[in-house]
């Protein structure tokens, strides 16, 4: 599976929230199916995510700038929440 292609497809066909604040709110509301964080995501935020046992957290191998680019955005994205993957197979990472 090409992670970047699956991520773009989820953004295009599903419901994906970008940013730490939106991601934290999505977790709090219990709507997130999966969280993706950049490798350079702040450690305090990552610690908070690791305490959430009910949602899978995937660490993207690139920086927040690279994650933003993978999302098709011209800005940094350190965290995102996948609420609905749409036609993407990205949620299959939870089973891997």
Swiss-Prot record:
SUPFAM superfamilies membership: L30e-like
GO CC annotation, single: cytosolic large ribosomal subunit
Family classification: Belongs to the eukaryotic ribosomal protein eL30 family.
Disulfide links within the chain: none
Highest taxon above the source species: Archaea
Pfam families: Ribosomal_L7Ae (PF01248)
Keywords of this entry: Ribonucleoprotein, Ribosomal protein
Signal peptide: none
Gene Ontology terms, MF aspect: RNA binding; structural constituent of ribosome
GO biological process, one term: translation
UniProt protein name: Large ribosomal subunit protein eL30
